[in-house]
Amino acid sequence: MIELCGLKKSFSGKLALNDINLFIQEGEVFGVIGKSGAGKSTLLRCINILEKPDEGEVVIDGQNLMSLSRKDLALARHKIAMIFQHFNLLNSKTVFDNIALPMRIQGIDEESIKQKIEELLPVVELTDKKDAFPSQLSGGQKQRVAIARALSCSPKVLLCDEATSALDPATTDAILSLLKKINELYGITIVLITHEMDVVKRICQRLSVMVDGKIVETTALSNIFNKPESLARKMLYAQISPELPTCLTRRLADYATEKPLVRLFFQGEEATVPFISQTSRELNMDINILLANIDRFDGVTCGVLVVELTANPLLLEAFINRCEQAGITVEVLGYVLPDGL
């Protein structure tokens, strides 16, 4: 559906995209994640040639957009919609007229416009807001209008540029659920860029990780846990791992004591078995659970524990071996000072 081949883009001599190669399947929800400045937005804008790549090909539905005339490119863009962090609504126009705008620009007759809007308003749950103005809407409602406007010309691709980053958590959940519903209802290919792993894990089937203008990893979410060195997996663990409180970190030493502080990452079946209690009995050691969290990721249960052990170096080594045999990732964070927490 979308194929990017050898894309390069630079600004003032600095590479923003460096040899991007990517294939996105028709009908999937695909995430691109990375820190600010990684090149995510530039990549997204190259897909519809809002930013023209310096090199490479952008092939959508079998058509290379880089080789099209200006007129043909404008026609091809009719099937590529986009929503942004900021809603870009016309404040002087009603919800109806904001949604109608792209269709009127394309010369669609008013009766067809009315029918399309009547179809879309229930989908975005704004049936009672047809005659409202943007100033009368919440942030989430404004984004719903922007989504309906993007869908008005029946696109095959929807590009989402940090579409939830300006919203509160509850509204973000609602918008992500709406995007998932749209994907299932219309079969639209959705490309979503974000810096938040939580957004990706909610609705994406596959993702790419971008670092300094390069795609360093592309994977199905269901495969993340099979790749110990996966950067996406590390980003997931960082998201679900509770932050150590100051009262704990200030009691840590970087030299060995018999109170190692260990972080454990579980996934799949390992997250549902009584590993801690079994290991405590079998190794005859005290295991004090200090912090814990559990989550679901593409149908896989994953969790993190921070535990304080009572263990000499040999016992700590035995504990780590047991964890690794069980498929549990272990990280020694430090050692608790002898006088305790």
From Swiss-Prot:
Q: How does it sit in the membrane?
A: Peripheral membrane protein
Top-level taxon: Bacteria
Instruction: Provide the protein's localization.
Output: Cell inner membrane
Q: What is its EC number?
A: 7.4.2.11
Q: Which keywords has UniProt assigned to this entry?
A: Amino-acid transport, ATP-binding, Cell inner membrane, Cell membrane, Membrane, Nucleotide-binding, Translocase, Transport
One family name in Pfam for this protein = ABC_tran
Q: Which reaction does it catalyse?
A: L-methionine(out) + ATP + H2O = L-methionine(in) + ADP + phosphate + H(+); D-methionine(out) + ATP + H2O = D-methionine(in) + ADP + phosphate + H(+)
Which InterPro entries does the record cross-reference, listed alphabetically?
A: AAA+_ATPase, ABC_transporter-like_ATP-bd, ABC_transporter-like_CS, ACT-like_dom_sf, MetN_ABC, MetN_ABC_transporter-like, NIL_domain, P-loop_NTPase
EC top class named in words = translocase
Q: Which GO terms describe its molecular function?
A: ABC-type D-methionine transporter activity; ATP binding; ATP hydrolysis activity
Q: Where is the ABC transporter domain?
A: 2-237
Entry-linked Gene3D superfamilies: 3.30.70.260, P-loop containing nucleotide triphosphate hydrolases (3.40.50.300)
For this record, the Gene Ontology CC terms, alphabetical, are: plasma membrane
Tell me the residue numbers annotated for binding ATP.
Answer: 34-41
What role does this protein play?
A: Part of the ABC transporter complex MetNIQ involved in methionine import. Responsible for energy coupling to the transport system.
Family membership noted in the UniProt record: Belongs to the ABC transporter superfamily. Methionine importer (TC 3.A.1.24) family.
State whether it acts alone or in a complex, and with which partners, per the record: The complex is composed of two ATP-binding proteins (MetN), two transmembrane proteins (MetI) and a solute-binding protein (MetQ).
Name this protein carries in UniProt: Methionine import ATP-binding protein MetN
In which organism is this protein found?
A: Legionella pneumophila (strain Lens)
Q: Which gene encodes it?
A: metN
